[in-house]
Amino acid sequence: MAMAFKMATTGMRVTDECTSSFMDMKWKKVHRYIVFKIEEKSRKVTVDKVGGAGESYHDLEDSLPVDDCRYAVFDFDFVTVDNCRKSKIFFIAWSPEASKIRAKILYATSKDGLRRVLEGIHYELQATDPTEMGFDIIQDRAK
C-alpha cells in the first residue's frame, strides 16, 4: 500500500487506508468511528479498528487501550433544538496515564500531521482518562 502523505514533524506516514476509511466515514456514513495507531518500526499511522455505522460512542471508548496511546475520529449525529439533523466529526488524541512516555511523545508530535490529512474535523479532544472524553463532553461541544 502506498503512503500518500508524510507527517513533517516525525517522518510518520499516513497509509491510504487511513484516508479512505475517513472519507468513507465522512461521506458514505459507513463507519461511526475509526481508531488509528502508530506502528513505530515501519513509521506509519495505520487503522487499528473501525466501528460500524450501528456502533456507539461507548463502543469507541471500550476499544481504546488503557495502557497505550491512540488517535480516534468519531462521527457524532444529533438533532438541534430547531429539529435539524447535524453531524460533527471529533478528533480524539488518547494518551492515558499508564502509557509509556515514549509513546506519549511520539503521538503528541505526530498528531498535527494526521489532522492535516483528515480534512473536515470539527472538534478536537485530548484525553488522558475516560472522564476527559465522556459522551457528555461530546454533546456539549457539538452544541
UniProtKB/Swiss-Prot annotation:
InterPro entries: ADF-H, ADF-H/Gelsolin-like_dom_sf, ADF/Cofilin. It is found in: Cytoplasm, Cytoskeleton. Keywords: Actin-binding, Cytoplasm, Cytoskeleton. GO terms for molecular function: actin binding. Pfam families: Cofilin_ADF. GO terms for biological process: actin filament bundle assembly; actin filament depolymerization. Actin-depolymerizing protein. Severs actin filaments (F-actin) and binds to actin monomers. Belongs to the actin-binding proteins ADF family. This is Actin-depolymerizing factor 5. The lineage of its organism: Eukaryota, Viridiplantae, Streptophyta, Embryophyta, Tracheophyta. The gene is ADF5.
